[in-house]
Every structure is written in C-alpha cells, then in structure tokens.
Regions:
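Helix-turn-helix
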Residues: 12, 16, 20-54, 58-62
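Amphipathic, non-transmembrane alpha-helical scaffold segments
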Residues: 14, 60, 64, 109, ...
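Amphipathic alpha-helical segments used for helix-helix packing
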Residues: 99-119, 169-174
Length: 208
C-alpha cells in the first residue's frame, strides 16, 4: 500500500472512530464498532494501528496540528496586542477555532474522564510561554504605549485568550446560550474592558 493510500485509510478509520468516541466514549467503543463504521476489517485496522488508543491519539494529533495552524495564523496577524480592537479580533478568532472543531473539545472531556487528562495535559503546560513565543517582540512592545501595571504581559494575554475560549466552549460544547446574559458582541466588549481597564474608575482623576 502506498503512503497516500495508507494516509487515506487512516483518515477514514479515524473519522469513523471519532463519531463513535464522541457518542459512546473511549471505553464504550470497541474495535469492532470502528471496523463496522469505517468499512475496514478489524485485521486491516490493526495494520495501521496497534491499539485502539493509537487511533484515539492519532485523532488528537490531527486536531492539534489544525489548532496550531489556526492559532499561529491569527497570532501572526495581531498588531498592538492589548489594543481593544485587536483583542476583539482575537475573540472572534477563538470563536472560529472553537466552533470549527467542537469534536476536539469533546475528545478532551473524554480524556479528562477516562484517562485523567493523560493525552491533553501537555497542550496547556506552560501555555503562556507558547503564546509569548508566538507573539515575540510585539508582546513587550504593546505594553509601552501607556503606564503598564507591571503584570506579566504573557500571563495577561494568555488569561484573556483562555477567557474567550471558556466563553465560546460553553456555547458550542455545552449548548449554553448567552452565558453572560448578553449578546456576544456586548459580552466580548465587557470582557475586554474588564481585562484591560479593571473594575474600578480612577477617582483620583475625577477629583482633579
């Protein structure tokens, strides 16, 4: 079998397995189930994957490649990182990632329940460092346009990034409408305001 044919077979097997995993869980899915759904015999599947877990890991790796491509694409296009308009663009980029790959997040929750997050923990380990590396000098430069508070900029942008993820995950994966009680545009604007300006007005400025 050529490499192209082998890759095509693996994609077909993984696609079939994914549909079953997200409905029945990992341990609730048998190789026989995957064989029936994919149209390949069990023996044929074992030619490509030594175990069922290898199929599961293959799915995760394929999603992670797409995730990294999307994340790097919008990170490269961010200008002044903490500008409110740029943060709004970031929010909608996160929306695109979450809504275009809902099964990735379902696999993550399966992993938490059935594997104690064995296959996903690395994805978020030292995540702020990964974001910092992707943004490079722009991250530090973006703190120089005003009186920066002293918060680690990598920590700040990563916190904002993850807040957007949580917001849209509630909508797509948990089917929660308007989790903050506002339309998306207003909710995003409020999150950005809270993250960049804080909760309190500077009364010292009002008295002068």
């Amino acid at each position: 079998m050529s490499k192209r044919d082998a890759e095509r077979a693996k994609k077909r097997i993984e696609a079939a397995a994914l549909k079953i995993f997200v409905h029945q869980g990992y341990h609730g899915t048998s190789m026989r189930d995957i064989a029936k759904a994919s149209g390949y015999s069990i023996g044929n599947i074992y030619n490509h994957y030594k175990t069922k877990e290898k199929i599961y890991v293959g799915l995760i790796r394929r999603f992670e490649t797409r995730m990294a491509e999307k994340r790097n694409e919008f990170m490269e296009n961010l200008g002044d990182v903490f500008d409110t308009r740029e943060l709004e663009r970031l929010a909608w980029a996160v929306h695109d990632i979450v809504f275009s790959m809902p099964d990735y997040w379902r696999l993550m929750y399966i992993d938490v329940v059935e594997f104690r997050n064995r296959h996903f923990a690395h994805s978020f380990h030292q995540f702020a460092k990964k974001v910092e590396a992707a943004l490079g000098e722009r991250l530090e430069t973006s703190t120089r346009r005003g009186s920066w508070s002293g918060v680690d900029p990598a920590l700040a942008i990563t916190t904002i990034y993850l807040q957007f993820f949580n917001y849209f995950l509630l909508q797509k994966v948990f089917s929660v409408k308007q989790p903050l009680g506002l339309p998306d545009q207003q909710a995003i604007s409020q999150i950005i305001q809270m993250m960049t300006r804080g909760l309190w007005r500077d009364t010292r400025l009002e008295k002068t």
